[in-house]
Design a protein with these regions (language model features):
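Hydrophobic alpha-helical segments within soluble ligand-binding/sensing domains
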Residues: 158-181, 283-302
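Hinge/cleft segment of the Venus flytrap/periplasmic-binding protein
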Residues: 297-353
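Extracytoplasmic "Venus flytrap"
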Residues: 51-72, 76, 87-97, 120, ...
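Extracellular/periplasmic Venus flytrap/periplasmic-binding protein
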Residues: 193-237
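An alpha-beta-alpha
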Residues: 73, 165-208, 306-328
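Bacterial Sec-dependent N-terminal signal peptides
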Residues: 28-48
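Periplasmic-binding protein-like
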Residues: 53, 109-120, 140-144, 237-247, ...
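Flexible loop/hinge segments that line or gate small-molecule binding clefts
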Residues: 135-159, 270-278
């Protein structure tokens, strides 16, 4: 009987202990539910944006325009290491078309993708394929060196005008040609932006100039051996050469380093005064800075300016005199700068009408 009493007493204590524990559990659970109800729902993780750059065929390594674009990409990547960037350097326009069309055909996804067509050569290709294939909502395009405006708000264009800077190059050339004619060397006769540079130089020079084209297509940008060969004749005939031919310019600069009897020259796209003592100055494009700013705006806002023209007064284009010639030519360049800006504006106003 005694043992049973002890047993019943222990059971009673156990029941009371369980009841107390259950009450504590229910209170804790209720408190937890209230706590979670007060907390905001976590935002879904945003997919990592992707950026694709399609360079001009054979363009990378030109120590000029394309390498300056690459520098801008690197500037952006330094502070945005989480963004996926893919770079294509095709060998031909046919390969470029395949890369671009394959991308356009990809199905819609939740990943934002920007495709940068980093050459004016791609404008006809873009027009052809975009007339047949619509962009899915997650896709955007940035077309370099184009003033075309598209109805699709996800297609953006820009052009850095070379007119004003080339006008100042022409002013400089007029002072150092030494009584000889000047020569404008262009990669081809179909690329709009380089024809703008030609027109600016001719207007600044103010006299008749000869014009030569290295090719009738994009290969004029990658024909350095041909340009080097032609310098044998050009060096005898001309007092100043204004070359707008991308990587082909390296053949001209190489000749001027190897032969003393070389004409004065202009550098192109970046400061190239270190490549030859005959380079009086360079038509520069600060496209590295511009591209970095465009990419930053896109990843933060999802958009960019639709169509923009950047001229001499924007700071993205300029005529940069080589240090060895600055004292001699800076007064004339400074005096002509305001005229160059006004002429550039008139040039585009006329083209718009």
């Amino acid at each position: 009987m005694f043992s049973k009493t002890i047993s019943l007493f222990n059971i009673s204590n156990a029941i009371r202990a369980c009841a107390a524990a259950l009450a504590l559990f229910i209170a804790a659970a209720a408190s937890s539910c209230l706590s979670h109800r007060d907390e905001p729902e976590p935002e879904p993780e945003r997919p990592t944006p992707q950026i694709i750059f399609l360079f001009s065929p054979g363009g990378l390594g030109d120590m000029s325009y394309n390498d300056c674009i690459l520098k801008g990409i690197q500037l952006f990547k330094n502070d945005n290491s989480d963004i996926d960037i893919y770079i294509y350097s095709p060998n031909s326009l046919e390969e470029s078309e395949r890369i671009f069309s394959d991308w356009l055909k990809r199905p819609e996804s939740n990943i934002p993708v920007l495709f940068a067509l980093a050459s004016s050569d791609y404008e006809p290709m873009a027009e052809e394929y975009l007339s047949e294939l619509a962009l899915t909502p997650n896709k955007s395009i940035l077309l370099f060196e184009s003033l075309k405006e598209y109805a699709d708000p996800n297609i953006h264009t820009f052009q850095i005008s070379m007119y004003g800077a080339s006008y100042l190059a022409g002013v400089t050339a007029a002072q150092c040609a030494g009584g000889k004619k000047s020569l404008v060397v262009l990669a081809n006769n179909s690329d709009g932006p380089i024809s703008v540079a030609r027109d600016g130089f001719l207007d600044g020079y103010g006299s008749e100039c000869d014009i030569e084209y290295l090719a009738d297509d994009w290969t004029g940008y990658v024909s350095a051996p041909l340009a080097y060969q032609k310098m044998n004749t050009w060096a005898q005939e001309y007092g100043f050469i204004f070359p707008v031919a991308g990587g082909s310019n390296s053949g001209i600069y190489r000749y001027s380093r190897e032969f003393d009897a070389s004409p004065f020259l202009a550098g192109m796209d970046i400061d190239q005064s270190s490549l030859s003592t005959r380079i009086t100055g360079s038509v520069i494009k600060n496209i590295d800075v511009l591209i970095c700013q465009y990419l930053l705006e896109w990843i933060h806002t999802g958009t960019m300016p639709e169509s923009q023209l950047y001229g001499l007064d924007s700071g993205y284009a300029d005529w940069f005199l080589a240090p060895r010639y600055k004292e001699e030519f800076q007064p004339a360049v400074t005096e002509a700068r305001r005229v160059a800006i006004e002429k550039e504006k008139e040039y585009y106003d006329t083209k718009a009408h």
